[in-house]
Amino acid sequence: MPLYIYTDVYASGSVPRGWVPTRGGTVKYPVRNPAVHRYLRQLLPGRWQKVIKQGNSGAVHYFEHASGQVAGVKYYPN
């Protein structure tokens, strides 16, 4: 499945409009899968990291570039 780059998680269309991130509910770590990391760097060269954000109605998982752009946004309801 190809990954697309968006300006933010809401622009992806995967996150519901009422979703609000919880304070202190963010985990960021390096992309561990070498194939995915290589693919992301082909899309946009630079530093990428995996982000998991907890929110009021579920969690959002995505890859974030150093510029703030995101890819591979997935929403998991509670």
Language model features: what each stretch is:
Residues 1-78:
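Catalytic toxin/effector domains delivered as secreted proteins or via bacterial secretion systems
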